[in-house]
A protein has these predicted regions:
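Hydrophobic alpha-helical transmembrane segments of multi-pass membrane proteins
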Residues: 4, 81-90, 132, 171-177
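A short amphipathic helical element positioned immediately N-terminal to and/or at the very start
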Residues: 4-21
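Interfacial loop/helix-cap signal at membrane boundaries in integral membrane proteins
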Residues: 10, 63-79, 148-168
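A generic alpha-helix surface/boundary motif
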Residues: 12, 96-100, 183-185
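Selected alpha-helical membrane-embedding segments in polytopic membrane proteins
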Residues: 16-128
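Hydrophobic alpha-helical transmembrane segments and adjacent short intramembrane/lumenal linkers
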Residues: 113-227
Length: 227
């Protein structure tokens, strides 16, 4: 239970949590906690995501001239929800690989298992972002959510330029308080677990943030209609 409790404690006592991580890296317990909460939030979002997906699938079927009812959007949503822990795992591994490379460049030898634990605990801010997104959608009401863009309320620099789309818009959306807090935690974690100066830890986290942001936005641009 201590490893799960540290998912909350890391927000208030990051140095103490990452000291324990440095002594004994932990992944399965915090990952399981993140995955369970992520799936619960995704299920709670279904009243907002399902109508949008149904409309998009019906529009796609009409554009292709397909007769009959559109595919079952609910089935696709449940499949996507079940797959979320797998996607989360892949993202954690990718992010850890980037942090490991940056740690090796800036601070010497990086310990992948320890860094995976650091990144996993730092990802709690992403889960908080999902919860805030759900809250915003609930306040707006399902009747006011009609497109995929409505499912991604502005929470970052995109608040300053709401009309900006495409690659730049994706970058602005990615620079938000939750992402910054997550990489701040990563910087603290790298510094504590690898006994590096705090400034070096922050530099590693900042470089990793830039790389992951550019990769994420570039992949998002590959989706149909992203431009």
């Amino acid at each position: 239970m201590g490893a799960l409790a540290d998912l909350v404690k890391v927000l208030f006592e990051p140095t103490a949590v990452f000291t324990r991580v440095g002594e004994e890296p932990r992944f399965l317990a915090p990952f399981s906690g993140l995955a369970v909460v992520q799936v619960a939030i995704a299920l709670a979002m279904m009243p907002y995501t399902r109508p949008v997906m149904e409309a998009a699938m019906a529009q796609a079927a009409q554009a292709r001239g397909l007769a009959g009812p559109p595919p079952n959007a609910g089935m696709f949503l449940y499949i996507a929800i079940v797959a979320q822990p797998v996607i989360l795992l892949l993202l954690l591994l990718l992010s850890t690989a980037v942090v490991w490379v940056m740690t090796s460049l800036f601070g010497g030898e990086g310990k992948f298992g320890t860094l995976l634990s650091v990144v996993t605990y730092s990802t709690i801010t992403f889960i908080i972002q999902l919860a805030v997104t759900l809250l915003v959608l609930a306040v707006r009401g399902a009747e006011n959510i009609q497109s995929p863009a409505d499912l991604q309320p502005a929470l970052g620099l995109d608040l300053l330029a709401p009309e900006t789309k495409g690659f730049v818009g994706g970058v602005l959306k990615g620079v938000n308080p939750f992402a910054i807090a997550g990489y701040w935690l990563t910087g603290v974690g790298v510094s504590v677990t690898h006994r590096l100066p705090r400034g070096t830890g922050y530099a590693i986290a900042a470089a990793s943030f830039v790389v992951m942001l550019l990769v994420g936005v570039s992949l998002a641009m590959l989706r149909p209609g992203a431009r």
